[in-house]
Amino acid sequence: MRKRKISVCQQTWALLCKNFLKKWRMKRESLMEWLNSLLLLLCLYIYPHSHQVNDFSSLLTMDLGRVDTFNESRFSVVYTPVTNTTQQIMNKVASTPFLAGKEVLGLPDEESIKEFTANYPEEIVRVTFTNTYSYHLKFLLGHGMPAKKEHKDHTAHCYETNEDVYCEVSVFWKEGFVALQAAINAAIIEITTNHSVMEELMSVTGKNMKMHSFIGQSGVITDLYLFSCIISFSSFIYYASVNVTRERKRMKALMTMMGLRDSAFWLSWGLLYAGFIFIMALFLALVIRSTQFIILSGFMVVFSLFLLYGLSLVALAFLMSILVKKSFLTGLVVFLLTVFWGCLGFTSLYRHLPASLEWILSLLSPFAFMLGMAQLLHLDYDLNSNAFPHPSDGSNLIVATNFMLAFDTCLYLALAIYFEKILPNEYGHRRPPLFFLKSSFWSQTQKTDHVALEDEMDADPSFHDSFEQAPPEFQGKEAIRIRNVTKEYKGKPDKIEALKDLVFDIYEGQITAILGHSGAGKSTLLNILSGLSVPTKGSVTIYNNKLSEMADLENLSKLTGVCPQSNVQFDFLTVRENLRLFAKIKGILPQEVDKEIQRVLLELEMKNIQDVLAQNLSGGQKRKLTFGIAILGDPQIFLLDEPTAGLDPFSRHQVWNLLKERKTDRVILFSTQFMDEADILADRKVFLSQGKLKCAGSSLFLKKKWGIGYHLSLQLNEICVEENITSLVKQHIPDAKLSAKSEGKLIYTLPLERTNKFPELYKDLDSYPDLGIENYGVSMTTLNEVFLKLEGKSTINESDIAILGEVQAEKADDTERLVEMEQVLSSLNKMRKTIGGVALWRQQICAIARVRLLKLKHERKALLALLLILMAGFCPLLVEYTMVKIYQNSYTWELSPHLYFLAPGQQPHDPLTQLLIINKTGASIDDFIQSVEHQNIALEVDAFGTRNGTDDPSYNGAITVCCNEKNYSFSLACNAKRLNCFPVLMDIVSNGLLGMVKPSVHIRTERSTFLENGQDNPIGFLAYIMFWLVLTSSCPPYIAMSSIDDYKNRARSQLRISGLSPSAYWFGQALVDVSLYFLVFVFIYLMSYISNFEDMLLTIIHIIQIPCAVGYSFSLIFMTYVISFIFRKGRKNSGIWSFCFYVVTVFSVAGFAFSIFESDIPFIFTFLIPPATMIGCLFLSSHLLFSSLFSEERMDVQPFLVFLIPFLHFIIFLFTLRCLEWKFGKKSMRKDPFFRISPRSSDVCQNPEEPEGEDEDVQMERVRTANALNSTNFDEKPVIIASCLRKEYAGKRKGCFSKRKNKIATRNVSFCVRKGEVLGLLGHNGAGKSTSIKVITGDTKPTAGQVLLKGSGGGDALEFLGYCPQENALWPNLTVRQHLEVYAAVKGLRKGDAEVAITRLVDALKLQDQLKSPVKTLSEGIKRKLCFVLSILGNPSVVLLDEPSTGMDPEGQQQMWQAIRATFRNTERGALLTTHYMAEAEAVCDRVAIMVSGRLRCIGSIQHLKSKFGKDYLLEMKVKNLAQVEPLHAEILRLFPQAARQERYSSLMVYKLPVEDVQPLAQAFFKLEKVKQSFDLEEYSLSQSTLEQVFLELSKEQELGDFEEDFDPSVKWKLLPQEEP
């Protein structure tokens, strides 16, 4: 074990390098990340071209003159309601000079005013009286008063023009608003008090106060710019959120288990994105300073603000990655929070918020950032330089904002760390909410050695007869002690107990296997032992370290190597880089990292793939890499969860050898689904069932207690008589049973306790050659049978035991079940009649349409994108409607004094001030002052008139009172920043005069605006349709690219093999896609007509557009199909194609707009650009509509031909699709009735390579294949004939000028599969199995040779194959029943027959409970069952099974094997099966063929291959007295001189005996019986080589030179070393 030292710095650096490599190698993601940011930066850079910053110099007082000098009256006055009082008031108003000659009209209500206004040619001012003293003045928008309510502190309120200075505050004065207000106020006062003040109010003068210099931003552009600043880091933050969430979910818990510190994980991502933020903040500060958006504040101020804001967003992304589990949602949530909180920050720009509220809201970093930006704008406005913050100018607020952003960053990080601790991860690991209050969290004291409790010492269940006691030498070596461990998960409705009170020990120096069915709790137990999961109750100690203590867990991480069930690697790193990363995470010393990596690469034979990216590795290579990561650092404890899953036998044996070499002084615990792996590798097996401990012990113990016995396999010739052999066997062993028989083969079960009878039996078998026995072998009961017996299930033996119909099961109900399965499956042979021709074509179309519709229901992203596109079409309508409602409802702003002036006793606060009144009468004006004070206004009075109110802009307004003979005269001075100042001061003066006479009432004036009514437009709705059509032209990629998914999950290939016609596939898709797309058009037209119902003019053109829309739908959908077919091997990229369609359409619209009166150009555009066809038709139709409306000429019929263009496009794309299918599509199984594509027979090419040095069995098979090929008797022909197959692939060039070298996958392979036969095709990765399967299915065309399937040369045509691929070619969201019904329809079964067949198959394979379950919710075993059922559905004569039982537990494998045997036994069908699992081949195959380096190395029955190529027998003995071990070893070497001791575990001794030492078998058993009696053996077993051993022996011949490195990195083998005695 290598010394480890966990270093946060080393881990951080390793993870940081990993993150940089990810960014470099995932160029698409990195490009999008930076491109989005840079595009936003570019938008900010071009800002000066569309925005004007007002740098306004100081301005002296502006004199506006008397209010009655307004004489440019362009409006008439309408008022309501009409009463005596209002009539008197408005008559007085009408007598004013500026309304001379203008009409003042009274109308009864608002509706009457609207009707009058709509037909009146001049501008109208509406006066609406609420009561005598309150009224609304409503001016037309843009006339008489500004449209905005108020100026903001950062916006410009005055502008320099060529001739003069324009201030918006003067609009009220110059456009007549104040004049009309003064006239109405004077009339009200005169009518209600009989006191005329018309002269006083008409003589009021106005002035703008002196203005200081300012720099003002203005308009919506400023807000858009600020919004762009808010989202300036969004691209980085989105990808940071996605990456961190994804890595936390998939890898962090596993890396933590290896010793990763949390701080290293967060630092690695934080430092990476801090660097990105630093660069982006630098660019942003440069752009903002160069564009003069922020003028006076220094570069460092802007840079620090953006830098801290970006860092806070990174911290926020980390926090959300913990609270939100899905990566996409995390990025979306962070973006929405940024936008929402940032937009909330606009309130700081437009409102003066209380300081306490600003501090609280600044805990939201986007708000704090916007607060900082608002402060910078305000500083610019006030001309305060802010190169460096200084308290004297108020810029210390920027320092406070920066502090809050830094505080937010720390707060978000602290919350992220806290929530990560207390929220359970996917394994349920969590800490209590107040964990930080415990002293153990802050100081980890040295722990004391754990002392086993008394109940722990006595709790081991070894005393039970189902548990073998540990050998004496292991007493005291209990490394892992499991006591009363229970694990519960929350379920619906009850809790699920994964483990139930487990109690057992695991010993140092032993390899222990955890066995059990799927869901037994194996992975859960290993997760608990590795620290990933926490038990609900119970305790676990590992080398006296308690898993419940965090300090102990950290210590154990240095001792443990874990290989979880899922592969652990980063796909964007190479094999070496993955190993280096995890070596550093594990704390291997830096100087030893390279040496350790080199060791692992050599031991696992991965040197040749060390520079291959993990994403390019095969499944087996990824598994080997995960195992390599587990053994890094030579750990003392190995916890391996199915470490050899997906490995070929050669690689499995590599792993076994490595574990055997390391077991001394180490603890090795692994789980597996392969019973043979546990049998060979593990010293001790622990069986779990339903979470409970079932039994534990060595193989010999378990086989003796639950095994069936020995299996005697006899290979027979033609003269054999079964009854004679059975009689002979029973003569020696009466309780022997004939367990299975097949053509040329008998298998008997011999009880274990009858081994003393074996010598005489074998002697007689050798002595009677006339019995017809060619050879025989004996094998011990398998651990698989033990497992199934423990589970209470029946089994078929791995040497062909329990061939259905001949099974002698131990239980009657098992026998009935097996026979029933055979009857059910064989009954399907009668259902051979299927429909064909056009009827089948229509049925297939409906089936594919159903699939498309079901898939569409679950394509949420595509539907969401479609919905967003349609919603975008509502934007113009929505904006227009909103704006109309805003102004139709007329913003009403009361001109109250409290807009600008303080109330008495109110604390001063911005922007309110006191009202300054200057007395220049030379006398007392107390009566007026008292009247103004009565309006609840705080006054500052200059009683002596010494001040000039116009020179002091610190006040919002000032009133200067002068004396003019008998009356007062007034001069109003307003601060130019206060937009409504003049109307407010006019009301104050008016109420002051009214109060002097009648103090109990006040006049209230409100200002409003209204919109001018538009005129009807007979073709207005076309604009909306046009906008919608531009958007909907981008919809097809989201609707019609489903075929790419079908291609990638191989569903399309599976459908083709099942007999689907290419045209049926595309028309089935189109049936749904075109309908959906046409519904989009219907929706568009309906919404256009509804929203413009009053403006709609329905003509013949609009009716003709309906079939045009139908043709356009077909055209664009089939155009998308063509694109999907061409780019089927790449990514779907719906968004990119949608954008392309959109851009093309937009440019086409521009072309139409500029050439609408050129008749040829729009027609050419419409014809050449399919996405723009509908737009072109609409343009041309609108042009014809104009002609029909404004011309008396009859419309020409010729332009209507343009509506046929979409149908022409559809025909062109359909023909293109047909050509693509014919040229590049795979071999069709049936003749396509529409595309007219017939099944193509490949041209037979002579194989250039003559076979050399072939095995005699392979030569015989080649002759048999040639004879079958030339046979004219189709009834006797095999169902599969593969003759002289050769397949070459084009290799890659190693250099620009190097010659391309072809890679040969198969070399002159010939074999045939007879009726009723299952032929197993075995071989390592790269041996040529998959290529052979692809040639048979038609996926690959052979370079030479030919394949004939039953009926392809005559007789009944083979219309479909049965194919169970290695990858589950299933649709994730469809249920099991839906899959079965679709494939039944594709294969041509009538509905009634399909229902019967589905019911029978479901019952036979026990799939009733899963019928309504979506495939994505099924276990791997159920998916494999479904694939098998789909392959045999429709009773195909040829079935190809590629790893059919992969991923199944032993029980599921047995069910699958039974189904395979029942399906093909005594039928007209045949099957070709490929597998890595030798037990599967032994269980179901009549013959097996082993491929080596693309050639057939051998072929024949299993027993024949064992006898021919098997070199060893395995001898196991268990002694009672350990003192007998050495004498026994000497005796074995004397009896069997070439015996090689394999292992010795205390009382268990294992030897490998060469065949020549064992023959004759009778003599070998005779010797062993003597040994048993002489040495008082407890038990012994002698069994023949397994098929796996034969396979490995033959596989030594696969050499390195057969393939180049760049063809398939998995094909790297070396000669296995010979076993030494």
Curated annotation (Swiss-Prot):
Residues the record marks as carrying a glycan? 71, 84, 194, 243, 484, 555, 616, 724, 797, 919, 948, 967, 1270, 1308, 1373, 1435
PROSITE patterns the record matches: ABC_TRANSPORTER_1, ABC_TRANSPORTER_2
Q: Does the keyword Nucleotide-binding apply?
A: yes
Transmembrane feature ranges: 30-50, 220-240, 268-288, 299-319, 327-347, 359-379, 397-417, 864-884, 1019-1039, 1070-1090, 1106-1126, 1136-1156, 1161-1181, 1197-1217
A GO term, aspect molecular function: ABC-type transporter activity
User: What membrane topology is given?
Assistant: Multi-pass membrane protein
Q: Could you identify this protein by its name? A: ABC-type organic anion transporter ABCA8
Taxonomic lineage is: Eukaryota, Metazoa, Chordata, Craniata, Vertebrata
